[in-house]
Amino acid sequence: MAERANLVFHNKVIDGTAIKRLISRLIDHFGMAYTSHILDQVKTLGFQQATATSISLGIDDLLTIPSKGWLVQDAEQQSLILEKHHHYGNVHAVEKLRQSIEIWYATSEYLRQEMNPNFRMTDPFNPVHMMSFSGARGNASQVHQLVGMRGLMSDPQGQMIDLPIQSNLREGLSLTEYIISCYGARKGVVDTAVRTSDAGYLTRRLVEVVQHIVVRRTDCGTIRGISVSPRNKNRMMSERIFIQTLIGRVLADDIYIGSRCVAFRNQDLGIGLVNRLITFGTQSISIRTPFTCRSTSWICRLCYGRSPTHGDLVELGEAVGIIAGQSIGEPGTQLTLRTFHTGGVFTGGTAEHVRAPYNGKIKFNEDLVHPTRTRHGHPAFLCYIDLSVIIESEDIIHSVTIPPKSFLLVQNDQYVESEQVIAEIREGTYTFHFKERVRKYIYSDSEGEMHWSTDVSHAPEFTYSNVHLLPKTSHLWILSGGSCGSSLILFSIHKDQDQMNIPFLSVERKSISSFSVNNDQVSKKFVSSDFDDKKKSEIPHYSDLNGNLGTSHYNFIYSAIFHENSDLLAKRRRNRFIIPFQSIQEQEKKFIPHSGISIEIPINGIFRRNSIFAFFDDPRYRRKSSGILKYGTLKADSIIQKEDMIEYRGVQKFKTKYEMKVDRFFFIPEEVHILPESSAIMVQNYSIIGVDTRITLNIRSQVGGLIRVERKKKRIELKIFSGDIHFPDKADKISRHSGILIPPGRGKTNSKESKKLKNWIYVQRITPTKKKFFVLVRPVATYEIADSINLATLFPQDLFQEKDNIQLRVFNYILYGNGKPTRGISDTSIQLVRTCLVLNWDQENNNSSLEEIRAFFVEVSTKGLIRDFIRIGLVKSHISYIRKRNNPSDSGLISADHMNPFYSISPKAGILQQSLRQNHGTIRMFLNRNKESQSLLILSSSNCFRIGPFNHVKYHNVINQSIKKNPLITIKNSLGPLGTAIQISNFYSFLPLLTYNLISVIKYLQLDNLKYIFQVINSYLIDENGRIFNLDPYNNVVLNPFKLNWYFLHQNYHHNYCEETSTIISLGQFFCENVCIAKKEPHLKSGQVLIVQRDSVVIRSAKPYLATPGAKVHGHYREILYEGDTLVTFIYEKSRSGDITQGLPKVEQVLEVRSIDSISLNLEKRIKGWNKSITRILGIPWGFLIGAELTIVQSRISLVNKIQKVYRSQGVQIHNRHIEIIVRQITSKVLVSEEGMSNVFLPGELIGLLRAERTGRALEEAICYRAVLLGITRASLNTQSFISEASFQETARVLAKAALRGRIDWLKGLKENVVLGGVIPAGTGFNKGLVHCSRQHTNILLEKKTKNLSLFERDMRDILFYHREFCDSSISKSDFSRI
């Protein structure tokens, strides 16, 4: 050693990293033995100093960082602003979550960065500080949790909890923080147990892939290499990683500086030579790697490089494959034990920001950017290419280049201040990011009615459900209102807008109501627990119920009529068709069969012309069994109900009805069983069975007869035909038709005897084979259609006598076509004939153009007896009825009960009392999700608020012009509430509604641009012409709501003119909260404009939810939602967190070459793209060779980058060589393709790339193949040794396949020799002379063959040579630091 006087003294703190570097340099200079002696001295010195210092750790040593208070306060302030934006509907839940996480993560990081300087200044000898930064115990993250803040935690699923733990462990946690903290602690313990086994299994699979790779030669003779460059177009490679990549490698080419050769080919690189090359500033260095080795199942010394143990070239016989597998798998085992130390604390990255260096004005080219939303919901500009941004100050012009795919957060010509963020560079534009697709469910905070403000489409997988896709960013609105269950409807059947007393009974949401009625009485069956828990089916006592009624008045608005078929009695009046119910006061239980008249009313309550109003199912035409219908060939008119097409249900099946002019029809019974394809049938086709014979395991036959089995798609149809079987003689003439009906009285020939038939029979010829046939005689049921059965006997006669407006006709319909089979489901009966009552109305009157009538229920209570009516009224155009002057009682069509929509029905007086009360609740009825019951939405005064009076309000002059044209139309003080206009439109017509979010508009705004077309269910706001009605009973005023707007005048006093900035408020418009509509006026709350008056508006409060394109909305428009119901599902991408708990699955995912649940870059898709493009450019024979090789090179580099990124993020250093050996094995196979068939390999066969190339050269013809990526499991099962495969997985399958193919195992690998107890071909068992001799012999044979090369092969070799040069140059541009 040098003399002590010449030694250099380094006064530095040595931490763990410095110790590693010191040991490495000592080994390079002095060797192993001397280095161990020096390290012993260092160890002794350390123990002596630690004993003298006698450090102890007390709670007083944990000093909280002083700046923590204001940092946390600032983060809370940002979170509060974010919460307000979310409440106003400016950002949605996912954007809020992202921004909240980044706010708290940044706060936590600032605290962690301040921790070290704080300790250094205040207490440099603090034991906590000394321990954590010496590497002896703990690290900066753990100390940060002790003295900073714990920060954000992950839940057991790896999702982030957006409530941060603001305390540290020194201050102590609150109860909530402790529970959240337990998530991470438990997660660590569980991960330690589970991930250890995962890491062990990963190691086993890795070793399995590469166990046979042994160093068997010194030089394979390859001329290829991979270029490594310290400089890259994206960023500089760190010098440490560059040195780490080069040390221990072998050069693939000479390195020249000028004309001087500083390093030659096949020279191994040590630390000295690498430092010299860095000093010279060499641009790119070509090195040999396991990728470039020409061997198939082994590796040469020069391609591997130096041994990691002693620093010299690797020895022959070294089992480098097993070393590589252990090197990658073992850190995974170790890292799982480290997870719980950070206790599931979230670690992530924030985006890089570009800040303005000083105050100035921003200038950039607006054509190169387009507006977008950032992931936090902020408005920004996205640039696709490098964008030059100029900041102009008074005397300085500064230019900044923004990289592609970055967000520009400022506008052109905007003034910015110093240090203001002007751009956000998106992280990971140059690296492969592990992202996963996450679903975020948003639940409704309150109950109410759902609206949306854009067109929606059905999600493709939910075509028949209530899930819709949003095509663009829009708001979802939950309009306020309380809900009430459906059992309330049973005693509150009223006309729309009626006021009524609602009984305060406890109502369950899931109560079922049904009606069953015959001609004499109406019984209502309850299947709910509203009245008595013990009695499940009971008829309520109406007088008792009326005694329990509350005193609150509500306003009833609903349009959906009962879905159940209600049976009614009918009575007729002049312009309305009123059918009264009859109610029963007895409390006895009544179960009346469903044999009465059923009335079919569409959901929307609208009948079209010639639609079926009521029907009667006669029990005589009802069958339990399946069969076939037969009748004559008279005229049959197919009729489809129009209402069925209008009904809004999930899946609507249309049942065709046949109007028959026949007097009888025939029913041929048969037993039918529809069985799944996999069913075990215990009877044979064309066999004869008796009654109660077992057909399958669970099914027995109901009748005896002939079995007929038909196999159809995915099902088996088994029919049993009852009847007699006859084998006729040859002389008998049997009809070859499928079957004929024989009437009674005719004879049939059977055994030369003649008989007379008593009943109709059905003769069917059955042919089991071509030569054999027999006749099956089946019984027939005959049905006579009697004319006397019609509804005239069931309804009062005056229904059919009056001919004013509405006409009723009676028809008989056969529900099945001639020869059509009828199928009964389980135990249900089949109705064959239906007697229907068809509605029509007089077309000779003035209102002949009307094609619709409307039906609604009315209930009148008189002295405790409740009468229910169904009223059918013609829809008329109300604009033709204008009130006559000086005649307040005459109001045209609007009769007494229409005069005021707020009228109540008193249970005592029995007459309609008109009363106009303030603040009555408005009740709307909606479809429930099960489509069987209904819900009421109660809108009371607490859900609405009034804003006004306003100043500077100006009505648009369109109204004044319309008044001049028609002086009869007057404007009253109040325009009625939205939704309470008289129903005059079809609910299913397309209704225009104003829904937009712009509030302040300069000058006049064309309202046509703001209209969206909706298909609205249950909506009766505006008719097709956009009219809405004033509900003042004495003034029938018709106004156009699209012209009924307010304009607020804002004076601009700086100029001598008045600029008209119009803020438009329209009926039905939605407002977000905190919007100021006029100066010095109050801010609006979020809601929908319900009433527009001269000086004020009434707004129904609503909660907006912002949703972005691609979100899935659960529910229909105007459907009622309860608190906690799923409102919308967001699908977004998020980076997976960086802990090794999720890092290990990432490594496994890359090595298995599969995408589990992430949407990360899938290499298999890239491979397909490469193959297609290269083949298209170069043609088939050239393209496959070059395409496969290019693809393999690209995928290898990408895979190495990904695996290294995971391990480096954990601070684990693994040499690239180990990863390259693994990746080489999983990318070394190609798939023989069908183009250009070869005699050697089968299409779809997996062969090695080098083997394919050599075979092609030997055969002097091209073999077409494609590159494939095998995972480590598939690669282990596709080796040359079947013993190795069988000992890994699927032993029986592998051995059976090998036996059938006659495979030979040459026992070249380590594992198969271990299994059979032989000497392993590695280390001392490696036979050097034999291997070399055989290899040289093979080379001589190949050289003899290559003398006869064809022109094609020479061209191919040249192309491949140039391709390699191209490949090497392209790789040199890439960042090898990620390899």
From Swiss-Prot:
GO terms for molecular function: DNA binding; DNA-directed RNA polymerase activity; zinc ion binding. It catalyses: RNA(n) + a ribonucleoside 5'-triphosphate = RNA(n+1) + diphosphate. Its EC number is 2.7.7.6. Its main location: plastid. GO terms for biological process: DNA-templated transcription. It is an enzyme of class 2 (transferase). InterPro entries: DNA-dir_RpoC2_beta_pp (IPR012756), RNA_pol_beta''_euk (IPR050254), RNA_pol_Rpb1_3_sf (IPR042102), RNA_pol_Rpb1_4 (IPR007083), RNA_pol_Rpb1_5 (IPR007081), Rpb1_funnel_sf (IPR038120). Keywords: Chloroplast, DNA-directed RNA polymerase, Metal-binding, Nucleotidyltransferase, Plastid, Transcription, Transferase, Zinc. It comes from the Eukaryota. It is found in: Plastid, Chloroplast. In plastids the minimal PEP RNA polymerase catalytic core is composed of four subunits: alpha, beta, beta', and beta''. When a (nuclear-encoded) sigma factor is associated with the core the holoenzyme is formed, which can initiate transcription. NCBIfam families: rpoC2_cyan. PANTHER family: DNA-DIRECTED RNA POLYMERASE SUBUNIT BETA. This is DNA-directed RNA polymerase subunit beta''. It comes from Nasturtium officinale (Watercress).
